[in-house]
Amino acid sequence: MSNGVFEHSYASGSPDSAFYIGQCYPCKVILDDVTGAYSGLGYSGTNSGGDMYIVRSRFVHNRSGMSTTTFDIELYPPGRDTAIIGNLVTDSGLENEAAGFYATETIAGNGIALVGTHANLLERNYIARSRNNGILVLPLLDRHYWPATRHVVRDNTVVSSGRADLAAGGLGTLHNCFAGNRYRTSLPWGLEILNGCDGMRVPIASDLSADMTFFGSIAQVFTGSFKVVDYRTRPVPPPQPNMPGGPQAPVVPAVHPFEDHTLGLDSIPQARESP
């Protein structure tokens, strides 16, 4: 998909991705006020980016909340230049809740995972109750080695993660910065201190345990030891509001939907979880 907008949409119960954008650069795609639930991945973007925005959305009860990845098997690597702003990402990796299959299991349990991608922006998101990591930055080894680099992770709230709220792995995880985040735990320790956005960065500040968890998940896939949840058993989505005007609303051709959509990036609030 390129040059398009998903808005006010609900997707649930997919063994793969509730929402997926892949193989485009620049994509010119906006996801605004969407919900992805009970799926292998709430949002997945492979080899996508460039004028790419995911804003004001909810990704809940998925194997993995959101991921941007790079794979040699698809066109236009690496994934890069995606803005993820003001989203709610909760309850990622609870095995009895979300549908899934082998491909989604490799990064299960992470709220937002940036795997082998470049220059993404994570800002004002709220990530809670991830089984493994709230935010994970990790390189990827495919036919080529894809470092995770030049990401900006700032002003996010990350709570109640199983391993770490903020995690950076791999020896090639360089030139990423973390600033202004509200969190309790990080791997490695002092991630914001050693890799801040306005000061000195120490390139050795990464943690190989994140890589071991990733490779352990791959081993589970190859041995068939991960739990498969049938998508047909997932909760039926609740009634959703209809489009303005209902079936009688006038049909307007989407000639240039990306340009016509008002993003208002500076006015997007910090995402919060409803009480």
Regions found by a protein language model. Give the residues of each.
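A short, structured loop/turn motif at beta-sheet edges
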Residues: 121-126, 157-160
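Hydrophobic, well-ordered secondary-structure elements that form the walls
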Residues: 153-156, 178
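Acidic, glycine- and Ser/Thr-rich low-complexity intrinsically disordered tracts
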Residues: 160-275
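Surface-exposed substrate-engagement region within the catalytic domains
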Residues: 129, 144-152, 160
